[in-house]
Amino acid sequence: MDMMMMSTRLIHLSRHFPQYGFRCHPSGLISSARMQYNINNGLAHMGKQMPNTSTHTTRIHPASFSSDLASRKYSLIYAFPLIRGLRALSRLKLLQTGITVVLLPTVYYLHLQGQASVLVLNRSIGIALFAGVMLYSISHFVRRVVGMMYLDSTQTILKVSHLSFWGHRRDIYVPVSDVVTLGDSGDSRGESILRLKRYSTSNTMYFSTRLGRVVDRHAFGKVFGSLS
């Protein structure tokens, strides 16, 4: 009697919930495999419709970070007027080296045609090599000369302007905490050429308080220490 009542209830449930796969077999047992398959399909379908609530961490790219630093307000604390002359010298050597390299194939062609001697060809090659070495040496020196230095309003970021290999202005942004003071760098405050050193890198740049001009001594002291 109890088995008949249970079968009747199962048949009643299977009519109302056919999507869940309830079936009453003659023996009165539910097909568990069929029910498990339909439940898995239902969960998979629900998983497709569920929105993705996972959180994503926004990554700060170096370009956006540099753009943020460039948009800050800076005050000039040091200027080197002779940087314009160094820029002109760098571009002149670049132009001279370019002309020499362009003329070298012409001299070689004239030598093949018998219109230029071996001595002229050797001199042309020597001049081209010398121009290349001089260009590299001058550019190596000029790129390490500080043209201007600025300090932001919070006095935490130092903007350093110098020349690139092509003679263009280039700005780098250095945390003040990363700058080595004059007392720790080993330079005497009375020296003509001082070193701009950082804790995070071995690259060294150079500036001069004699040939250059300290615009804001108080802000300059915040970065490099007192000049007195």
From Swiss-Prot:
Belongs to the TMEM186 family. May be required for efficient assembly of the mitochondrial complex I. The chain crosses the membrane at residues 94-112, 119-141. Residues 1-93, 142-228 are mitochondrial matrix. Keywords: Membrane, Mitochondrion, Mitochondrion inner membrane, Transmembrane, Transmembrane helix. It comes from the Eukaryota. One of its GO terms (cellular component) is mitochondrion. It is found in: Mitochondrion inner membrane. This is Transmembrane protein 186. Residues 113-118 are mitochondrial intermembrane. It holds the Pfam family TMEM70. GO terms for biological process: mitochondrial respiratory chain complex I assembly. InterPro entries: Tmem186, TMEM70/TMEM186/TMEM223. Disulfide bonds: none annotated. It is a multi-pass membrane protein.
